[in-house]
């Protein structure tokens, strides 16, 4: 405690970020402050050189403070910089006591550029800095279904490069376009179609009515398969905003955020109102073993959502709960980010309070539906058996695949909320000379990406204790807290024993080795994760091998033999690089003597 006491006595009065560590140098918490000295000292009570938690703090904070052995600070110019740095470090390092929300992906917007002669609806996630652009959204889902419907219902220009081609295409022949490329429609006539398109984007009911008419016409012509496509699309568009009953007389543009939860679980609901109508909504489930702080979670939710420059910003942001201090910080952050004043408030009456109540009602409903499943019980049992500090809500599983150390590849699969998240899977081409070097490269590349994609609760490695130790070393050097287990086949005569029916899996943790019965649900859970990563990696290896064989065949046709192909690969690194190289460069490599 001498180090901690010394640090507490020499704190700066500057703005910055502070980090708390336990006696094992494990990161406990990251926070930010306008005045580091004032903020950090508020956690502690110091009497006669004895440090104790501030008795006015919450039980969650007091529990954390009892574990603090060291602290570090990072000084910045101002509170805005501190807020942004704090959020970035939390996502990258994932401290034990911070609430970690998923990175808020920018939702898509539909836009039309009326500065062009023939505007068409398109999707964007970025601001297009040009006059005449009209945005609609954000859409948490269904944007593509709306876009596809508009192009099928209206004779719009179907492709961005159509006008440049100066020649009517197949869409004109099937009466899906009026061929402005050949001046078969005037700008004024086309603008009427574009305005009708706008009306359909703004009025979902009108769009659905047009789709229903189209579906009925197809059914009457016995074109049932096409009619089914429209039926499914109507269902998707109807689900875009489940709160469309909320239609206010005042044309508010509002974003609404509401949290509901207990000490270790919560739900965040986001609703987006444009022109007095709720146009879309989304929710996120949050888990935390070390307590839930609404203020901290709200702060991270707002920063995650607004730190990217969004095309449309509301005039006001409504929250269900937040301290005055955090509310002020967030308002300054957003106003600074978008160079205009945007109000954040916690409504107490009227229409805006009713909106918060609807968001809360939905958060409560989603929360109540999350019953404890068998999978949750298995997770809890696995956590207890493997002595994991955190519940493995998000798991990343790694495997490598190669043939005689050629076509070396690796795969990462992700398991979250009791399901495989295929959108988060990653593939890697590897250069390692053996399975250990390949796993080291795979894990290192993932760790280097923690700033962009925050680390999970748990890594599962397909391998033995050697691979487990490689993972632990990489995580230690990254400064991130991720727990690790590995699963391998038992060995006989120093080789993995894989005879059918005889292979037994062994689970390795940093402190133990487990040989569980095949019927053990905890073993089966880890096996399920391992098998998916193995399937993913080996499929990538096979496709890579097939692609390489085709490339070798093409090179052979050009008179380049296998030995020469190997020489070129060793030098250029890939077939793509060989293709890009000039004949002179390739000849120079082939003429070199080893």
Swiss-Prot record:
Every UVR domain range: 205-240
GO terms classed as biological process: nucleotide-excision repair; SOS response
Keyword match Mitochondrion: no
One Pfam family in the UniProt entry: UVR
Domain of life (superkingdom): Bacteria
Key words of the record: Cytoplasm, DNA damage, DNA excision, DNA repair, Excision nuclease, SOS response
GO cellular component, one term: excinuclease repair complex
Domain (GIY-YIG) ranges: 13-99
Family of this protein: Belongs to the UvrC family.
Protein name in UniProt: UvrABC system protein C
Record organism: Helicobacter pylori (strain P12)
